[in-house]
Amino acid sequence: MESPSLPMTAKDWTTTSLHRVFAMQGGEDDLSYVNNSDSQALAITLSKPILISSLQSIKLFSDQTPIKITDLGCATGSNTFTTVDTVVETLQRRYTARCGGGGSPEFEAFFCDLPSNDFNMLFKLLAEKQKVDSPAKYFAGGVAGSFYDRLFPRGTIHVAVSLSALHWLSQIPEKVLEKESRTWNKGKTWIEGAKKEVVEAYAEQSDKDLDDFMSCRKEEMVKGGVLFVLMAGRPSGSSSQFGDQDTRAKHPFTTTMEQAWQDLIEEGLIDEETRDGFNIPAYMRSPEEVTAGIDRCGGFKIGKMDFLKIVEYSDEKQEEWKKDPVSYGRARTNLVQAAIRPMVDAYLGPDLSHELFKRYENRVSTNQEFLHITCFYGVVVFSAIRV
């Protein structure tokens, strides 16, 4: 069968075009990020003490201007609201303790993400939440743009958070898109198990992106402000993107994803070059890489840095899946679609994208081994004070 004309090619993955199509799956159906972000919610819950501790340790801002908070890479759903609530409530308690009931300033929260994010859904959910909270805890606004660029005037942000977002790169490394080079990622759609040159190209892009992120925050934040970041990461000393073999085998971006792409090739729906031109723009940094990036930037003092392991599913849920592998396959496919479906749609087109994820679901549903091994998602979390 002749390969169809595709909407995008490997060379289209410039910063501009990736920003145009990259977003978590919008809406609130079974594929949406809203309904497939439990692991991120658990990571936020486990790291919450680090955020609260950093907010309790800083000197309170003394002027009467509103306290400005931003969530960088907010996506959609309750995770962003939960974290902003934590910031507001923690600081309100401190101001009340110091000044009494009328001593707390007003708060503004800016929800930031790429223009392709589903801001309509985000603010629909926020409006529903604020009806329950009435009166609202803060004034809210949306900012469409990349957190690898400046988003706010100099010295205006008091608290900046970024949750499960900074492992997404600003672009596919240009070297990886050069077909005749050693860095062409042949046979792969990500870097786990890829050639050393491919991994190094991703690491270089990761360092550049982290430098850009930190430099922008350095300009935007007030002295004494808090930067709190949680991102997918890997353990210290691990050359792999993961810390254990089971996670390496079971992670949504690895074995099953590669098999699903290979199925399309073997069925004549796409050719190998089409598969090789698609690369997932994610890199799991180690704590050492994150620390080095903060140090290169200067202007921040690290308060706390930690690596956490987030279990994919509880033991009880795992036992449920063993009895119903078809539902497990569907749930796992929904999870990966929530993260990368918009990007795959843009690359393959909706029809071929649908075929890819059908094969992904079938692979997961029929892999009995997956039901008996545990996958952990690693996260690096840190708090830092603007100095």
Swiss-Prot record:
Disruption phenotype: No visible phenotype, even in gamt1 and gamt2 double mutants. Optimum pH is 8.0. S-adenosyl-L-homocysteine binds at residues 33, 74, 79, 113-114, 146-147. Induction: Up-regulated by alamethicin, but not by herbivory. It is an enzyme of class 2 (transferase). It comes from Arabidopsis thaliana (Mouse-ear cress). Its EC number is 2.1.1.276. Belongs to the methyltransferase superfamily. Type-7 methyltransferase family. SABATH subfamily. Pfam families: Methyltransf_7 (PF03492). Down-regulated by Zn(2+), Cu(2+) and Fe(3+). No effect of K(+), NH(4+), Na(+), Ca(2+), Mg(2+), Mn(2+) and Fe(2+). Its cofactor is Mg(2+). Overexpression of GAMT2 results in dwarf phenotype. The keyword Acetylation does not apply. It catalyses: gibberellin A4 + S-adenosyl-L-methionine = O-methyl gibberellin A4 + S-adenosyl-L-homocysteine. Methylates the carboxyl group of several gibberellins (GAs). Substrate preference is GA4 > GA34 > GA9 > GA3 > GA1 > GA51 > GA20. No activity with diterpenes abietic acid and ent-kaurenoic acid. One of its GO terms (molecular function) is gibberellin carboxyl-O-methyltransferase activity. The gene is GAMT2. This is Gibberellic acid methyltransferase 2. Mg(2+) binds at residues 185, 275-276, 278-279.
